[in-house]
From Swiss-Prot:
The protein's role, per its UniProt record: Catalyzes the phosphorylation of the sphingoid long chain bases dihydrosphingosine (DHS or sphinganine) and phytosphingosine (PHS) to form dihydrosphingosine 1-phosphate (DHS-1P) and phytosphingosine 1-phosphate (PHS-1P) respectively. Redundant to LCB4, is only responsible for few percent of the total activity. Involved in the biosynthesis of sphingolipids and ceramides. Involved in heat-induced transient cell cycle arrest. Accumulation of phosphorylated sphingoid long chain bases (LCBPs) stimulates calcium influx and activates calcineurin signaling. Involved in heat-stress resistance.
Gene3D superfamilies the UniProt entry points to: 2.60.200.40, Probable inorganic polyphosphate/atp-NAD kinase, domain 1
Name of the gene this protein is made from: LCB5
Chain positions recorded as ATP binding sites: N276, P277, F278, T308, E340, G366, S367, G368, R434, R440, D652, G653, E654
Record domain DAGKc: where: 266-405
Protein name, as recorded: Sphingoid long chain base kinase 5
Listed InterPro entries: ATP-NAD_kinase_N, Diacylglycerol_kinase_cat_dom, Lipid_Phosphate_FormReg, NAD/diacylglycerol_kinase_sf
EC number: 2.7.1.91
Higher taxonomy: Eukaryota, Fungi, Dikarya, Ascomycota, Saccharomycotina
Bias (Acidic residues): 506-524
Stored Pfam families: DAGK_cat
A single GO BP: response to heat
GO cellular component: cytoplasm; cytosol; Golgi apparatus; Golgi membrane; intracellular membrane-bounded organelle; membrane; nucleus
Bias (Low complexity) ranges: 193-207
Residue positions bearing lipid (S-palmitoyl cysteine): C91, C94
Protein's organism: Saccharomyces cerevisiae (strain ATCC 204508 / S288c)
């Protein structure tokens, strides 16, 4: 009894595998699906479809238009009328949502290595049904492309009926020809079909196509619910290659697609992945395996995965790894693992080579994920991975921390922030409720504010921009040059590709500030204009690691002491280099990647609760720095001397001892991956 339905399902499955190969062309924005010529077959289907849908036609159209970013299309031919409606406003979100990603990649071993060069035939779900005419697959989403040597048996030409084999005569029909011309053409086609059926061969028909039409399989990242997943689609792409002495004609099309898809970024990255299985809610491994790994393999990145087993393990891993085998370290974690990796590389005898060769980035799988939100503009693991694949290698400033207990042995590097007072205690003392995720920060801050606890100390500062007006001028001056000042890459407005594509405008994100308008990205076109010739200027040297203000030499004379009336009643002391310190906390809206300064924010513990309310409510927008009770400055270095007997510092979310802390900026020391070559736009210039 149970076998019969199973056989019927299998039979239907085999029949449903017959799919269409669609024609496409290359455009400046991506690969665009060509408008398909009408035929008696499609015309009859359209008429039948209209009759069956006449009673709900208006409803279906309204529903589609109001839910375009989340609409899922079925794979049968009854949707042709909807595709006609959508043709002018279609995008990659219109593709079928019925397939699931391949779960076979979810390895359970502690370490694994995946190299696509050894397994070039990875299988990804294909797109069900036709792609609407005028759909554009942006270069920013294309992961890989390759030629298909032979036409798959389960495909047929989208321009002909499913019962007829491929024929070049149909592909050459004008898109504007009328029904009579189509009928005449099909008569000729049927004659050709009878001959081909007699010889049982379709290869002769394929060879009659234009020599500039190639059958290509494209793997791209398609939105699925709140993520992106790799999908493949076979396309007949019309492309006439330019004359080239170093490219063969048959290689030119795929090479051109990949060049446009990976402009200004490294192809086939060699990635060393460090996963903290205990980070966040303990789901880092699952998030990486299901959300990130399929995209990395689809883009032909070679990856090696290791897992941390205890606090500080990533320091040892980075200190002992073979840096010649990799160009990127991806931390599938929160912000703690990038901190350990940076310091592990710093402790290497060949740290100069390590920081020159390797880019450090984050796949958000922890509680904070500030690095991903600031650099990739997203807290979503799959979108962050797509940005990792497509982003520009950029140098950012680091901060060097010195305390008496470890300064002589080895100073510590910080990429994110240092904090003392209310925020520090909240960050560290809520570790026991890590299972709550980011909500633990909000709960801890609210509890500490109600207590109005003071953290007396002495603070000495070397300012770069002391007042808020000076800071604003500094920000406006460096926003358009500081962040990409040292990038030797080439881009112009006529050939911008994925780097100006909004990866997240097709799904609702938890962080609304991640969504960027296309106009904002257009402003970056004139920023990325450096010459590739002098790449050695971007290399750091040993002297770049030299500390300008050693801890044992005392406080320099040009440093200013903060008013004791403020420092003795300190509520929050926070310095940082990235705009976000958590997915929903824009604490340093004026932070820039490489402006040579860090931001300092200070509050007074005596501030009333009624005045603290707008400060806290403005953290998600970054408007808290505009409040008169908040001190906001750009600084080059500082020293803070606590007066309490117990407490702690938090550096990049890690606990540091309560003893004098001295920090200075170290310009452009670390190489990371920034979307569009800059931090996420905080709109600080319009505040």
């Amino acid at each position: 009894m149970t076998l019969k339905p199973s056989k019927r399902r299998k039979g239907r499955s085999r029949h449903s595998r017959k799919k269409q190969i669609t024609s496409a062309i290359l455009t400046e924005e991506g690969i665009m699906i060509k408008a398909k010529p009408s035929s008696p077959y499609t015309y009859a289907n359209r008429m039948a479809d209209k009759r069956s849908r006449s009673s709900i036609d208006n409803i279906s159209r309204t529903s589609f238009q109001s839910n375009i970013s989340r609409t899922s299309f079925q794979s049968n031919s009854d949707n042709n009328s909807i595709f006609e409606t959508a043709s002018l406003i279609s995008c990659v979100t219109c593709l079928s949502d019925t397939d699931t990603i391949d779960r076979s990649e979810t390895s359970t071993t502690d370490t694994s290595k995946d190299d696509l060069s050894a397994n070039p035939k990875l299988h990804y779900p294909s797109v069900n049904g036709q792609l609407p005419a005028n759909t554009v697959i942006p270069y920013g989403r294309i992961l890989d492309a390759r030629y298909i040597e032979k036409e798959p048996l389960h495909y047929y030409d989208a321009n002909s009926s499913p019962s007829s084999p491929l024929s070049s005569s149909m592909s050459n029909i004008s898109e504007k020809c009328d029904l009579d011309e189509l009928e005449s053409s099909q008569k000729k086609e049927r004659k050709g079909n009878s001959l081909s059926r007699g010889s049982n061969s379709s290869s002769s028909l394929l060879t009659s196509r234009s020599p500039f039409t190639k059958l290509v399989e494209v793997i791209f990242a398609r939105p699925r619910r709140h993520d992106v997943v790799p999908k493949r689609v076979s396309l007949y792409i019309d492309y006439k290659p330019h004359s080239s002495s170093h490219l063969k004609e048959e290689d030119d099309l795929v090479e051109e697609i990949l060049k446009r898809s990976y402009k200004n970024t490294r192809r086939n990255k060699s990635i060393f992945v460090i996963i903290n299985p205990f980070g966040g809610k303990g789901k880092a491994k699952k998030l990486f395996m299901t959300k990130a790994k399929p995209l990395l393999l689809a883009s032909r990145c070679s990856i090696e995965v290791v897992y941390t087993k205890y606090p500080g393990h990533a320091i040892e891993i980075a200190r002992e790894m073979d840096i010649d085998k990799y160009d990127t370290i991806a931390c599938a974690s929160g912000d703690g693992i990038p901190h350990e990796v940076i310091n592990g590389l710093y402790q290497r005898p060949d740290h100069v080579k390590a920081f020159n060769n390797i880019a450090i980035t984050e796949i958000p799988c922890g509680s904070g994920n500030a690095m991903s939100v600031s650099c990739h503009w997203t807290n979503n693991p799959s979108y962050s991975t797509l940005c990792l694949i497509k982003s520009i290698e950029t140098r950012i400033d680091l901060m060097c921390c010195s305390q008496p207990s470890y300064a002589r042995e080895h100073p510590k590097l910080s990429f994110l922030s240092q904090t003392y007072g209310l925020i520090a205690e909240t960050d560290i003392n809520t570790e026991f409720i890590r299972w709550m995720g980011p909500a633990r920060f909000e709960l801890g801050v609210a509890f500490n504010i109600i207590q109005k606890k003071k953290y007396p100390c002495e603070i000495y500062v070397k300012y770069a921009a002391k007042s808020k007006n000076e800071l604003k001028n500094h920000y406006l001056e460096h926003k358009n040059k500081g962040s990409l000042e040292f990038q030797h890459i080439t881009m112009n407005k006529d050939n911008e590709d994925c780097d100006n594509y909004n990866y997240e405008n097709e799904y609702e994100t938890e962080n609304e500030d991640e969504d960027e308008d296309a106009d904002a990205d257009d402003e970056d076109s004139h920023l990325i204009s450096r010459d590739l010739a002098d790449s050695s200027a971007d290399q750091i040297k040993e002297e770049d690691f030299k500390i300008k203000y050693p801890l044992d030499e005392g406080i320099p004379s040009d440093w200013e002491r903060l008013d004791p009336n403020i420092s003795n009643n300190l509520g929050i002391f926070y310095t940082g280099k990235m705009p976000y310190v958590a997915a929903d906390t824009k604490f340093f809206p004026a932070a820039l990647p490489s402006d040579g300064t860090m931001d300092m924010v200070i509050t007074d513990a005596r501030t009333s609760l009624t005045r603290m309310a707008p400060i806290l409510l403005g953290l998600d927008k970054g408007s808290h720095v505009l409040q008169p009770e908040v001190l906001h400055s750009k600084i080059l270095a500082y020293k803070i001397i606590p007066k309490l007997g117990n407490g702690l510092f938090s550096v990049d979310g890690e606990k540091f001892p309560l003893e004098p802390l001295q920090v200075e900026i170290m310009p452009r020391l670390c190489k990371t991956l920034l979307r569009n070559g800059r931090y996420v736009d905080t709109d600080f210039d319009s505040m």
